[in-house]
C-alpha cells in the first residue's frame, strides 16, 4: 500500500487543489487525536487518506484508508506525493515513479454498482489470480461478457494491462467480494461460474467461498445447463464442496481427477511440478425457474437518510457500538469531526461478507448525509443495517 513516514506530518490549509486533486478536509478522530482522515477527490474518484501518529515507533504515517482505495494505485500514490512534498522530515516512502499498469484507468474496471441492472449473458471467474484462464475465456467467447472478480490489487492491475494490450472488449474486472456480486446479479444470466484453486481455509470454513448460500446464489444466477466449476489441488476442500453439491436439487455432476485443461494457471503448474493431484467438480444447473424476473429481493438501490439530529452525534460517546441480529450486524467503529462535518466509520451487513463504509454527515445550511465513494451494495443484510443506523441518527 502506498505511504510515507515522517517524524511529523504537516498539512497545508484545506480545502486546496493541486494537480487536479482536491484535498477537502481533515477530520480528526473524536476519541483519539492522533488519528485523522483526509478526504481527497480526483476526477470521479473519492477516497480517504489516514494520518496516524505511531507512538511506539516515534513517527507518523500517511496512507490510503483501505476500505476507500481506488484504482489504479497511481491515483493514490500521486495524492500522497503531493502531501509528501510539503514535508521537511520524511523518513521513508514507497512513492517512486508509477508503473504503466499503476496509471492505467480502464473502462473495463467496474464497481459492484454497475452490475445492479446487468442482464447480459456472461461467464464469471472468481479469484482469477494471474488471469490466464479468464483471458482465455474472454478470447474464446467473444459473444459473452466475461466478469472477473478479485481482491488482490496487483492481479487486477496486471489483467487490466493485458486487456488493453489484447484489445479485449468483453471483459469486466471487479475488486470485491464474489459472494456479494452473486447476490445482486440477475437470475439465469451466467453460462458458467469458475472457481479455480481457491484458498482452502480448512481450519476456517467460514472464510471459504463454497457454502450453502454460495450454492443457492450460484444456481440462481446460472442459466439452465450452466456450470459451476471448481478446480482444486486440496482433496479436503474438494470433498467438502462435493458434499455441499449433493445437498442441492436439480443438478448433475461431473468429477475428474488430473484432467488436463486447455490453459494451465501459474498455481496449477506449481502443483503439477510437485506431483499433486488436481480435482475438478463440475455442477450443472438442470432446472430453470419459470420466473425470469430479476432477483426481487434486491429492490432498494438508494440509501436515503431522514432528518439527522446533530445532538445524536455530539452526545454519542458509545464507541465502538455493535448491534448484532440473526442475519445482519452493524458496527459503528468511530466518529471523526471537521467542524460541521462528521464522519462515521462503519462495518455492517452479512457476518461472512461484511461491508466497510464511511458515512459523511454535514450540518451547514441544510443537513446532508451520504456514503463516501459510493453507496453500500444493496444486499438484504446491508439494507437492514442501514435502516437500524437511521433509527440511531434520527431518534429524538
Swiss-Prot record:
Xref: InterPro entries: SAM-dependent_MTases_sf, tRNA_(Gua-N-7)_MeTrfase_Trmb, tRNA_methyltr_TrmB_bact
Reactions it catalyzes: guanosine(46) in tRNA + S-adenosyl-L-methionine = N(7)-methylguanosine(46) in tRNA + S-adenosyl-L-homocysteine
GO molecular function terms noted in the UniProt entry: tRNA (guanine(46)-N7)-methyltransferase activity
Record key words, sorted: Methyltransferase, S-adenosyl-L-methionine, Transferase, tRNA processing
Enzyme Commission number(s) from the entry: 2.1.1.33
Chain sites annotated for binding S-adenosyl-L-methionine: 125, 150, 177
Pathway linked to the protein: tRNA modification; N(7)-methylguanine-tRNA biosynthesis
Binding-site list for substrate: 203, 233
GO CC term (a single one): tRNA methyltransferase complex
Protein's UniProt keywords contain Methyltransferase: yes
Function: Catalyzes the formation of N(7)-methylguanine at position 46 (m7G46) in tRNA.
UniProt record similarity statement: Belongs to the class I-like SAM-binding methyltransferase superfamily. TrmB family.
NCBIfam families recorded: PRK14121.1, tRNA (guanosine(46)-N7)-methyltransferase TrmB
Annotated protein name in UniProt: tRNA (guanine-N(7)-)-methyltransferase
UniProt source species: Helicobacter hepaticus (strain ATCC 51449 / 3B1)
Amino acid at each position: 500500500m502506498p505511504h510515507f513516514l515522517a517524524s511529523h506530518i504537516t498539512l497545508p490549509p484545506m480545502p486546496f487543489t493541486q494537480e487536479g486533486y482536491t484535498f477537502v478536509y481533515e477530520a480528526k478522530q473524536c476519541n483519539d487525536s492522533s488519528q485523522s482522515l483526509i478526504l481527497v477527490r480526483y476526477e470521479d474518484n473519492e477516497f480517504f487518506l489516514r494520518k496516524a501518529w505511531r507512538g511506539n515507533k516515534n513517527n507518523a504515517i500517511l496512507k490510503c484508508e483501505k476500505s476507500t482505495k481506488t484504482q489504479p494505485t497511481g491515483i493514490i500514490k500521486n495524492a500522497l506525493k503531493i502531501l509528501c512534498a510539503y514535508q521537511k522530515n520524511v523518513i521513508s516512502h514507497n512513492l517512486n515513479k508509477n508503473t504503466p499498469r499503476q496509471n492505467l484507468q480502464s473502462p473495463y474496471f467496474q464497481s459492484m454498482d454497475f452490475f445492479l441492472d446487468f442482464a447480459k449473458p456472461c461467464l464469471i471467474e472468481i479469484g482469477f489470480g494471474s488471469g490466464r484462464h479468464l483471458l482465455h475465456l474472454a478470447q474464446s467467447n467473444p459473444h459473452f461478457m466475461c466478469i472477473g472478480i478479485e481482491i488482490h490489487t496487483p492481479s487486477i492491475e496486471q489483467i487490466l494491462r493485458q486487456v488493453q494490450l489484447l484489445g479485449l472488449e468483453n471483459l469486466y474486472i471487479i475488486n470485491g467480494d464474489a459472494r456479494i456480486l452473486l447476490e445482486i446479479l440477475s437470475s439465469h444470466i451466467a453460462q458458467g461460474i469458475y472457481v479455480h484453486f481457491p484458498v482452502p481455509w480448512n481450519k476456517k470454513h467460514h472464510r471459504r467461498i463454497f457454502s450453502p448460500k454460495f450454492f443457492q446464489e450460484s444456481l440462481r444466477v446460472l442459466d439452465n445447463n450452466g456450470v459451476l466449476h471448481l478446480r482444486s489441488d486440496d482433496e479436503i476442500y474438494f470433498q467438502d464442496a462435493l458434499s455441499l453439491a449433493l445437498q442441492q436439487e436439480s443438478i448433475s455432476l461431473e468429477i475428474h481427477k488430473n484432467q488436463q485443461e486447455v490453459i494451465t494457471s501459474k498455481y496449477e503448474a506449481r502443483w503439477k511440478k510437485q506431483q499433486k493431484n488436481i480435482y475438478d467438480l463440475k455442477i450443472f444447473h438442470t432446472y430453470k425457474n419459470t420466473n425470469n424476473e430479476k432477483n426481487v429481493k434486491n429492490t432498494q438501490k438508494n440509501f436515503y437518510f431522514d432528518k439527522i439530529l446533530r445532538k445524536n452525534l455530539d452526545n454519542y460517546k458509545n464507541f465502538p457500538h455493535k448491534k448484532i441480529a440473526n442475519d445482519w450486524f452493524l458496527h459503528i467503529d468511530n466518529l471523526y469531526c471537521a467542524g460541521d462535518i462528521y464522519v462515521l466509520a462503519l462495518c455492517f451487513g452479512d457476518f461472512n461478507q461484511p461491508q466497510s463504509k464511511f458515512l459523511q454527515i454535514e450540518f451547514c445550511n441544510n443537513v446532508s448525509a451520504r456514503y463516501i465513494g459510493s453507496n453500500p451494495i444493496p444486499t438484504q443484510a446491508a439494507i437492514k443495517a442501514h435502516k437500524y443506523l437511521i433509527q440511531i441518527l434520527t431518534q429524538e
